[in-house]
Design a protein with these regions (language model features):
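A glycine- and small-aliphatic-rich helix-loop capping segment at beta-alpha/alpha-beta transitions
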Residues: 109-118, 196-199, 327-329
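C-terminal active-site "lid" helix and adjoining low-complexity regulatory extension at the edge
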Residues: 270, 289, 298-358
């Protein structure tokens, strides 16, 4: 019997378009002899769309948003999920929601309450990894080296601009980066060379979050590692993008047709081993399961800095995460998706054995 696979995508997030591209690639790769695919599109306004069995043949990207909408968010969530998950048969949810309300533990909490297996990280690890400020505190406690950083809330900025700016200049200096604490895909990030640019960067970052992170710039390479698994995760060979951009922003990541990958990255065996071990340590530190991508900086002196851990990395067929696995152990894209589904089912089965009453 086919497993019913419910693919969640879209969502109330500035990373909505990234989610659509990811869902399109994943759905096309699914083996329809094993899975019956039901797309659940969430609009930018938060409305959930009725899932119908999808015809993968001839699928176009626009087909993923041409679905009927319900009248209200509360009604639609109840009708869509409860009616579907009450049906007999094996079922798994594949959340492909990037950023707010999808990668922060919100949807994961709902799926936990519904008691259905879902791919990827749980409530706690999703929340921890998306909040860069909290994540950095965890990494520091674990003794993992990071770049110098400061965290500011919006109320601190409103209370005293000059105090924030002075502290940032004294402790971080220039050039520096300003980031929203809880966004991915390099959205809302600015590279600043002086006070004027820093003010503009802080203002921009606060458009997307009420907490921001300032980081000292590291001159060097950006290295990425894919991690997969539950209690005993595996780390891929490291990879890096080869590009001429000083600042690898959203447009560079998703629009640059000249972007090239180097997998495995040209590193010594010692550095390669160190990166893979640190990636798994960070994965455990955040209580991750299923998958994550861990990003590092490597400066000219050979010093490694863990930049961030991404609980739902880019997952199109040209994204670094799936390509790193293909070049590490030959795992093809469709096989990778099935492995992640298997990890979700195993984690769910383990949770069912936990006793919740005395």
């Amino acid at each position: 019997m086919q497993t019913k696979l419910y693919v969640l995508y879209g969502g109330k997030s500035v990373e909505h378009e990234v989610s659509l591209k990811t869902a399109y690639t994943v759905i096309q790769s699914i083996d329809n002899s094993k899975f019956e695919v039901f797309p659940i599109y969430i609009t930018r306004e938060g409305l959930w769309c009725s899932p119908d069995k999808l015809n993968q043949e001839g699928l176009q990207l626009n087909d993923l948003i041409a679905l009927p909408k319900h009248r209200s968010e509360a009604e639609s969530i109840g009708q869509v999920l409860m009616s579907q998950f009450a049906l007999p048969g094996k079922k798994v949810v594949l959340p492909l929601l990037h950023g707010s309300y999808g990668e922060d533990g919100t949807v994961q909490g709902m799926l936990e309450l519904l008691n259905v297996p879902y791919v990827g990280n749980g409530v706690l690890s999703s929340a921890l990894t998306l909040d860069k400020a909290i994540s950095k505190q965890l990494l520091a406690q674990a003794g993992i080296h990071q770049v110098d950083y400061r965290v500011y809330r919006y109320d601190q900025w409103l209370e005293d601009h000059s105090k924030v700016l002075q502290k940032a200049e004294d402790t971080i200096g220039y050039p520096c980066y300003v980031k929203p604490a809880s966004l991915g895909s390099s959205i809302g990030i600015s590279r600043c060379h002086d006070k004027q640019e820093l003010v503009a960067g802080i203002t921009e970052a606060f458009k997307y979050d009420n907490k921001i992170v300032l980081e000292r710039e590291v001159i060097g390479r950006e290295i990425q590692v894919a991690v997969m698994g539950n209690e005993k995760p595996l780390a891929s060979l490291p990879g890096e993008f080869i590009h001429d951009h000083v600042f690898f922003d959203f447009e560079s990541k998703y629009m640059d047709k000249q972007l090239k990958m180097s997998i495995p990255a040209h590193l010594s065996e010692e550095i390669t081993s160190q990166i893979r071990q640190l990636a798994i340590k960070a994965y455990h530190t955040h209580n991750c399961s299923g998958l994550a991508r861990v990003d590092f900086f490597l400066d000219g002196k050979g010093q490694l800095y863990l930049n961030e851990i991404n609980a739902l990395p880019g997952f199109t067929n040209y994204s670094m995460y799936p390509v790193m696995w293909e070049r590490t152990d030959g795992t093809r894209y469709s096989e990778l998706v099935e492995k992640l589904i298997d990890y979700a089912i195993m984690r769910h089965a383990e949770k069912q054995s936990i006793q919740y009453t005395r």
